[in-house]
């Protein structure tokens, strides 16, 4: 069985998920919906991907420049089994009525409230909870990053305190900032902690800052342990955790710039670093407290989760079979 997949919103996340879908033997990319005929729409067409207008209201935009569309989102929904909604935050909830009317399963992204879906999802943490579901939310890039490493040590966790150092904008985003400031999120906790709790039931508090960079987020994590764990134990656990990589400052990984360069050296599409990067030297245990620092490529870490969510929703594979297939297809190192 090949699941027929549509994508609503072919931008930073949508185009990456579209690429990932095209690499799966059990999925077929049927088409993508766009609001305007920008360079991403033209590129999709060049790749042979059918392009639809996200609404009848947007059709004139395409007609004005002679961009031939296949139809509208409603037409696309008639041809797919599942729609991946990669529209800006808040739009997914508005779009849900369309998906329900069409009788199509849907995957939402982390910009939506948890209430939009039946389950919030990170594959290695709660794959089984998405089995057979109609509506699944893949949590945000930051929440995915936190969940991957914390889930690996969840049996040792008493309480987590984490600081999110967030990138200001994606590389192609000219509308967001700041450019010359550090912007704190003065609400405590930031939304990331409660979001982690929608996936794994742990005690966690988070704070967040936005800084003038585009490459990656960085998390400073402190964990109060409820039972003994050594630095060597943590290193071994992370070494054996899928979609988590250890990077060493000693080998030149001084910053997020080198992590992105590493992804470029792997010839990854859009220099995707699907894996969460933990600096090995930062892993430290002092008494009952564990510390570590990790980096999150906000443009790509959620991509494999979308693929695994599709398999779970259609019960195409069990957890580790799906993760293995996704990892292999995308060149994820482990």
UniProtKB/Swiss-Prot annotation:
Residues that bind NAD(+), according to the entry?
A: 12-13, 111, 167, 298
Q: Which InterPro entries match?
A: DapB_N (IPR000846), GlycerAld/Erythrose_P_DH (IPR020831), GlycerAld_3-P_DH_AS (IPR020830), GlycerAld_3-P_DH_cat (IPR020829), GlycerAld_3-P_DH_NAD(P)-bd (IPR020828), Glyceraldehyde-3-P_DH_2_arc (IPR006436), NAD(P)-bd_dom_sf (IPR036291)
* E.C. number(s) listed in UniProt: 1.2.1.59
Q: Which residues form the active site?
A: 141
The GO annotation for biological process reads: glycolytic process; lysine biosynthetic process via diaminopimelate
Q: Does the keyword NADP apply?
A: yes
Which cysteines form disulfides? none
Where located? Answer: Cytoplasm
Q: Name one Pfam family in it.
A: DapB_N
Q: What GO cellular component entries does it have?
A: cytoplasm
Query: Which domain of life does the UniProt lineage start with?
Result: Archaea
Q: Which PROSITE patterns match?
A: GAPDH
Which reactions are catalysed by this chain? D-glyceraldehyde 3-phosphate + phosphate + NADP(+) = (2R)-3-phospho-glyceroyl phosphate + NADPH + H(+); D-glyceraldehyde 3-phosphate + phosphate + NAD(+) = (2R)-3-phospho-glyceroyl phosphate + NADH + H(+)
Quick one: which pathway? Carbohydrate degradation; glycolysis; pyruvate from D-glyceraldehyde 3-phosphate: step 1/5
As one GO molecular function, the record gives: glyceraldehyde-3-phosphate dehydrogenase (NAD+) (phosphorylating) activity
Coiled-coil spans are none
User: For binding D-glyceraldehyde 3-phosphate, which residues are annotated in this chain's numbering?
Assistant: 140-142, 192-193
Q: What is its main location?
A: cytoplasm
Q: How is the subunit organization of this protein annotated in UniProt?
A: Homotetramer.
Q: Which family does it belong to?
A: Belongs to the glyceraldehyde-3-phosphate dehydrogenase family.
Q: What is this protein called?
A: Glyceraldehyde-3-phosphate dehydrogenase
Organism the protein comes from: Thermococcus sibiricus (strain DSM 12597 / MM 739)
């Amino acid at each position: 069985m090949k699941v027929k997949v549509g994508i609503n919103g072919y931008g930073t996340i949508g185009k990456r998920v579209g690429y990932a879908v095209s690499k799966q033997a059990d999925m077929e990319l049927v088409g993508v919906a766009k609001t305007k005929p920008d360079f991403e729409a033209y590129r999709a067409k060049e790749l042979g991907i059918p392009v639809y207008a996200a609404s009848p209201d947007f059709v004139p935009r395409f007609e004005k420049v002679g961009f031939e569309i296949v139809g509208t989102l409603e037409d696309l929904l008639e041809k797919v089994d599942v729609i991946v909604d990669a529209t800006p935050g808040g739009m997914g909830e508005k779009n849900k009525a369309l998906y329900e009317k069409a009788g199509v399963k849907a995957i939402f992204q982390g910009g939506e409230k948890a209430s939009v879906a039946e389950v919030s999802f990170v594959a290695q943490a709660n794959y089984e909870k998405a089995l057979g579901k109609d509506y699944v939310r893949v949590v945000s890039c930051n929440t995915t990053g936190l969940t991957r490493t914390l889930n690996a040590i969840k049996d040792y966790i008493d309480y987590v305190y984490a600081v999110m150092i967030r990138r200001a904008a994606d590389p192609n985003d000219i509308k967001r900032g700041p450019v010359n400031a550090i912007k704190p999120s003065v609400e405590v906790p930031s939304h990331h902690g409660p979001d982690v709790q929608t996936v794994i039931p742990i005690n966690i508090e988070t704070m967040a800052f936005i800084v003038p960079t585009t490459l990656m987020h960085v998390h400073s994590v402190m964990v109060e342990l409820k039972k003994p764990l050594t630095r060597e134990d943590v290193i071994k656990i992370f070494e054996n955790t899928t979609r988590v990589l250890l990077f060493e400052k000693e080998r030149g990984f001084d910053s997020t710039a080198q992590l992105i360069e590493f992804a470029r050296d792997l010839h990854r599409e859009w220099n995707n670093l699907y894996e969460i990067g933990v600096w090995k030297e930062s892993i430290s245990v002092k008494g009952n407290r564990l510390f570590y620092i990790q980096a999150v490529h906000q443009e790509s870490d959620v991509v494999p989760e979308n693929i695994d969510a599709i398999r779970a929703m259609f019960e195409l594979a069990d957890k580790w079979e799906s993760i293995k297939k996704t990892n292999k297809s995308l060149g994820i190192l482990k």
